């Protein structure tokens, strides 16, 4: 587990990933309740639970995604720190008005770069619902590859089990940020 003091602040242009602040939990819960998000996530946790996650009282590190200074969603990671494995997992959600504009792709890319370069991981996994095509496109743009379908992986909001798609990205597969590429 990463201590709350170790939580990064990552920025790239208009996008910022930062530790949570008082008041963020209510906004994140509202985003999780939006139809475009709740379709893929379980019932939102109470504000108190989200506050605990933002403080670091959980095994996952939950961070806030801001776009142009507005809370757009959450991104979290968990780490396997055993040197024999040294990998991390990521999850992300963005409010409906921030979806489909490249923000998710950039947030995942930014966090992946941090996990590889600053935390020393060699592999990152992400596990969207197999039917969540927009998320899969987003992760593919970052460089993630499908490695298998996990049948009846998680219970959806409708109460039935749904397949998950396991995707991973190795350290040397992360392409440079589009802003950093040289023309020529």
What do these predicted regions represent?
Residues 100-114, 136-141:
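Conserved acetyl-CoA-binding loop-helix of GNAT-fold acetyltransferases
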Residues 39-99, 114, 170-174, 178-184:
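Acetyl-CoA-dependent GNAT
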Residues 15, 70-74, 162:
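Glycine-rich phosphate/pyrophosphate-binding loop shared by adenosine-nucleotide-utilizing enzymes
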Residues 117-127:
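Conserved GNAT acetyl-CoA-binding A-motif
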Residues 104, 108, 132-135, 152-157:
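Short glycine/proline-centered loop/turn elements that form peptide/ligand docking sites
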Residues 139, 144, 167:
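Conserved active-site tyrosine of GNAT-family acetyltransferases
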Residues 125-128, 145-162:
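Conserved catalytic-core motifs of GNAT/GCN5-like acyltransferases
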Residues 1-51, 172-184:
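A short, well-structured alpha-helix characteristic of acyl/acetyltransferase catalytic modules
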